[in-house]
């Protein structure tokens, strides 16, 4: 660290296991004129704790039951409503979405998180040393990107080392040691100038103790070449990842609140969508609604894709007009105190508030896929069996619509349905939108993932492999079973991405024979449909944390028939 840099940390003592969490703020750059503020701001400012509900604890997982046969799709595409609708109502928030984040006083459960990591490390003593992320300025500038820390080290802001009147003038007061102790369940907080002495003392008092680092670059001069301690850079990352798979009651409360805010913002978009002319308006309203409710940070960049853009899984331009298009896919969620939500709704476009016939067919199919999968969530279930269930429902629905043709078993064996359902059913959610899975994979033991993508890519070959794995039965090595305390998304979708379908599937005889091009051409303008909720696995089933309306409830709001 350069002279004058300010570094803060919090120390957590849990019996004989010490977890040391360091938050770093560095003012850098050749021409920076901003005083080193050392605010040690966490990844999302204003970290706080919420009142806890009943704890949701991880319990022994029963043996996986045989994969149930996906239910047959016994209802055809529903009729499309027509007729005049009343004008859109004024945007007066109703009680159901009048959600505003309030500052709480209960403590962040730092000791519990440290204890979970210690348990995964199988360690009764040791030191976890976690440097935080530095804040930086652009080269030759006094400005820089918004500060965001590694999700694994997000924490409350500890006290500054050198608070001066000038720093207060520029940046305001930072939390005192007393403030930090009041905000977090920790036993001791010190100023950063005490860190070298603390580490030297620890090494002398705990001869041959293990110091756990995420990687060697995160060490400290007081630890380098210190013969009194053993440095372990291999065990901490998998232990922390596994500890994050099941959430504490405090974490669940934060995810629930993030979903409440996001659901209210989605509802606001529904009330306005008939008056909007561009994707920009949709994205702007969503983020504004989150901000005024106290959750200004988005868990990921909002996706507001209309028409063909709805077929791009991670569309981000959000800059095209809505006129003449069938649907808008709005995939957007805020975060609260670093915990994410991830919510997707598909809205009809146009003045009537009704889906076009083709869009309604696809929406109803995706709705059936999601409802069946959510209803099946329970402890002990292999999550990837839900993906197969959704794929089977999609196959039968696309056969019924005539987009697919031929023998159902032959189409399934070829994996052709992946042309239209090309991504995984969902993912963990928590400190990150696409949260860590721990030692096992939620969906694929080894699969392609786009950089920074939220979804596993599922090719036809991967789908066939998943089905074969279920058919051969246990052991399910590397496949993750659902456990109480997990929060996962369930987000099936059907897409008509012309480049993808024609670039891969229509070029191969084994797929081309099962796709009716004439019928497919009628559905290309739909673009795509996705519906996504965040689902908490409970001891006896599940809780849907996402309250954004969908289906007929959504359509009534869009048409101004309900709030």
Swiss-Prot record:
Domain of life of the source: Eukaryota
Residues given in the record as Mn(2+) 1 binding sites: 342, 491, 532
Gene Ontology molecular function: any one: metallopeptidase activity
Residue ranges of the TM segments: none
Database matches in SUPFAM superfamilies: Creatinase/aminopeptidase (SSF55920), Creatinase/prolidase N-terminal domain (SSF53092)
A Gene Ontology biological process term: proteolysis
EC number(s) given by UniProt: 3.4.11.9
Broad EC category: hydrolase
Record note on cofactor: Binds 2 manganese ions per subunit.
Catalytic activity: Release of any N-terminal amino acid, including proline, that is linked to proline, even from a dipeptide or tripeptide
Cofactor(s) demanded: Mn(2+)
Binding site for Mn(2+) 2: 331, 342, 532
Similarity annotation: Belongs to the peptidase M24B family.
UniProt cross-references to PANTHER family, sorted A to Z: XAA-PRO AMINOPEPTIDASE 3 (PTHR43226), XAA-PRO AMINOPEPTIDASE AN0832-RELATED (PTHR43226:SF3)
Main function: Catalyzes the removal of a penultimate prolyl residue from the N-termini of peptides.
Identification of the protein by name: Probable Xaa-Pro aminopeptidase PEPP
Species name: Verticillium alfalfae (strain VaMs.102 / ATCC MYA-4576 / FGSC 10136) (Verticillium wilt of alfalfa)
Gene behind this protein: PEPP
């Amino acid at each position: 660290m350069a002279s004058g840099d300010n570094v803060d940390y919090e120390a957590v003592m849990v019996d004989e296991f010490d977890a040391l969490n360091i938050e770093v703020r560095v003012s850098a750059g050749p021409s920076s004129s901003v005083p080193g503020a050392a605010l040690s701001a966490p990844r999302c400012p204003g970290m706080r704790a919420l009142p806890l509900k009943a704890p949701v604890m991880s319990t022994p997982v029963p043996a996986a039951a045989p994969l149930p046969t996906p239910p047959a799709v016994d209802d055809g595409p529903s009729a499309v409503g027509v007729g005049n609708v009343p004008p859109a109502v004024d945007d007066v928030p109703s009680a159901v979405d009048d959600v505003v984040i309030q500052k709480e006083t209960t403590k962040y459960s730092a000791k519990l998180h440290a204890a979970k990591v210690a348990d995964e490390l199988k360690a009764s003593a040791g030191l976890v040393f976690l440097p935080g992320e530095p804040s930086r300025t652009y080269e030759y500038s006094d400005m820089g990107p918004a500060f965001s820390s590694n999700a694994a080290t997000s924490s409350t802001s500890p006290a500054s080392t050198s608070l001066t009147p000038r720093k207060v003038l520029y940046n305001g007061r930072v939390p005192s040691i007393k403030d930090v102790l009041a905000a977090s369940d920790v036993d001791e907080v010190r100023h950063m100038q005490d860190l070298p002495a603390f580490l030297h003392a620890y090494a002398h008092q705990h001869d041959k103790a293990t110091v756990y680092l995420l990687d060697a670059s995160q060490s400290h001069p007081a630890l380098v070449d210190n013969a009194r301690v053993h440095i372990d850079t291999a065990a901490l990352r998998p232990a922390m990842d596994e500890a994050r798979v099941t959430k504490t009651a405090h974490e669940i409360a934060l995810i629930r609140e993030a979903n409440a805010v996001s659901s209210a913002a989605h509802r606001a978009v529904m009330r306005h969508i008939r008056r909007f002319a561009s994707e920009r308006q949709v994205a702007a309203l969503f983020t504004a609604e989150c901000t005024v409710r106290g959750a200004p940070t988005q868990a990921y960049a909002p996706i507001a894709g209309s028409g063909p853009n709805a077929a791009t899984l991670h569309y981000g331009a959000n800059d095209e007009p809505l006129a003449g298009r069938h649907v808008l896919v709005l995939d957007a969620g805020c975060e609260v105190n670093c915990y994410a939500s991830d919510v997707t709704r598909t809205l009809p476009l146009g003045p009537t508030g009704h889906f076009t016939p083709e869009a309604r067919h696809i929406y109803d199919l995706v709705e059936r896929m999601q409802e069946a999968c959510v209803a099946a969530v329970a402890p002990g279930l292999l999550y990837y069996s839900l993906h197969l269930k959704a794929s089977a429902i999609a196959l039968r629905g696309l056969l019924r619509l005539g987009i697919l043709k031929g023998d159902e078993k032959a189409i399934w064996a070829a994996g052709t349905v992946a042309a239209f359902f090309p991504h995984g059913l969902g993912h963990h959610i928590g400190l990150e939108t696409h949260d860590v899975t721990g030692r096992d994979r939620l969906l694929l033991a080894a699969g392609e993932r786009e950089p920074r993508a939220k979804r596993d890519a599922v090719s036809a070959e991967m789908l066939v492999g998943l089905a074969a794995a279920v058919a051969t039965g246990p052991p399910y090595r590397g496949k993750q079973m659902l456990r109480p305390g997990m929060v996962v998304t369930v987000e099936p979708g059907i897409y008509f991405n012309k480049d993808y379908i024609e670039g891969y599937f229509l070029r191969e005889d084994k797929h081309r024979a099962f796709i009716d091009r004439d019928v497919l051409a009628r559905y290309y303008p739909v673009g795509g449909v996705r519906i996504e909720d965040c689902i908490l696995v409970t001891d006896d089933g599940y809780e849907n944390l996402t309250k954004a309306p969908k289906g007929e409830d959504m359509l009534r709001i869009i048409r101004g028939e309900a709030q």
